[in-house]
Amino acid sequence: MDLQRGFVFLSLVLSFMIIETTAYRERQLLLLQPPQETAIDTANAVVTVQDRGLKTRRPEHKNAYATMMYMGTPRDYEFYVATRVLIRSLRSLHVEADLVVIASLDVPLRWVQTLEEEDGAKVVRVENVDNPYRRQTNFNSRFKLTLNKLYAWALSDYDRVVMLDADNLFLKKADELFQCGRFCAVFINPCIFHTGLFVLQPSVEVFKDMLHELQVGRKNPDGADQGFLVSYFSDLLDQPLFSPPSNGSVLNGHLRLPLGYQMDASYFYLKLRWNIPCGPNSVITFPGAVWLKPWYWWSWPVLPLGFSWHEQRRATIGYSAEMPLVIIQAMFYLGIIVVTRLARPNITKLCYRRSDRNLTTIQAGFKLIALLSVVAAYIFPFFTIPHTIHPLIGWSLYLMASFALSSISINTLLLPTLPVLTPWLGILGTLLVMAFPWYPDGVVRALSVFAYAFCCAPFVWVSFRKITSHLQVLIEKEVLFPRLGDSGVTSGFSKLY
């Protein structure tokens, strides 16, 4: 197969994957188009809430678990999936409370309908709260709309509300939280409480006062809900620890919640087990880097608890939205493997004139393309695999995709098989080392991964050297670059002038 056909083959492969990935993302973006009927005046919407509170449709219980959704980030779909899993997991625990989603007006109606009709949530639509801290020098734009969480105080249909972030993982029922006082939260940080879960007593007056504090510029270190609420409830650290009364009575005032209601996942990674004696071990939270949230398939086995979240998803909403694309990609990659093994396309006999002064540049460029094709084989699949698929499926598809794309480089560019696949074997080994379930603690696990990576590094370097030296040998022997007029050159091959 000549140069032209080889590049056509590579172009078809990459074009198909780009089209499929773009089509999948466009299907998600179609869901993100804001409904036209929600274009209402912001000031009027907030005034209405201040006057009447947020009313849910046919409240069934006196208490509620609530979470929020808003648009405008690159990860809107992922957080929508996380919200669905949270709602479904609470339903599966048979909590005695309504499940409320505080959704901004630009959340797609299709998502709202799914939350209401399939997941059993009560969705209330709100206008985004304007964030006056967005011009702070340390402000992170992903926190721009987190002040929508303040709407929880306007849920006047309920006596108590447990406000939740979407990245909470419930291990068991926690309805005793509704016995807590007017405001209760967990101190993950010794001095700063965490707003991923807190209990509140709805009050329109408190909601009005919070909006007033926003207008006058109350101090807010991070410009998000966390900094504002820590400033607003600055005395919480001095309050007693919550212990639910055995008679079911409801407490008053402000209280600190035991750590078991907001167990930071990083504590688990130290011991690889939970051992928090103060309070029930009920809820896991995943603060930290957004790209390592548990719903991303690559978060496991890097972070072991990601698998627990995906098992909860598998038992609730499943993966039907992502599976069609996964099947298409798997069949496509399998086809690439078969075709490259049977047809063995290769770019050979790239001809040049004996007097060409740019030969060195051409050869260097060709070596660079060959090396980039190997690197791309391991990077490109990360952008095509659906982000929220189960880790076992995600990593299996990644290994298949990287193997298939590597086989194109091996057969098309005449590269040595083992050196090209050395990173593939290294990645597989890393996954097995990280997923090993019998480590005594997280320190031993981390040291094992480090030792494995240390041992693998020389093999990767040797493989890189072998690939570059092999390319140089091919060029020197004129396997890839025979001169015009040599007997091995036929008129059907491409020529460089």
UniProtKB/Swiss-Prot annotation:
EC numbers: 2.4.1.-
Parts forming coiled coils: none
Cofactor(s) of this protein: Mn(2+)
Transmembrane segments: 3-23, 319-339, 365-385, 388-408, 418-438, 442-462
Keywords from the named record: Glycosyltransferase, Manganese, Membrane, Metal-binding, Transferase, Transmembrane, Transmembrane helix
Family annotation (InterPro entries): GNT1/Glycosyltrans_8, Nucleotide-diphossugar_trans
Domain of life: Eukaryota
Keyword Magnesium attached: no
GO MF annotations in UniProt: glycosyltransferase activity; metal ion binding
Annotated Mn(2+) binding sites: D165, D167
Subcellular location: Membrane
SUPFAM superfamilies attached to this UniProt entry: Nucleotide-diphospho-sugar transferases (SSF53448)
Keyword Oxidoreductase included in the entry's annotation: no
Main location: membrane
GO annotation, cellular component aspect: membrane
Lipid bilayer topology: Multi-pass membrane protein
Site location (Important for catalytic activity): K149
CDD domains, A to Z: GT8_Glycogenin
Family classification: Belongs to the glycosyltransferase 8 family. Glycogenin subfamily.
Stated name of the protein: Putative glucuronosyltransferase PGSIP8
GN (gene name): PGSIP8
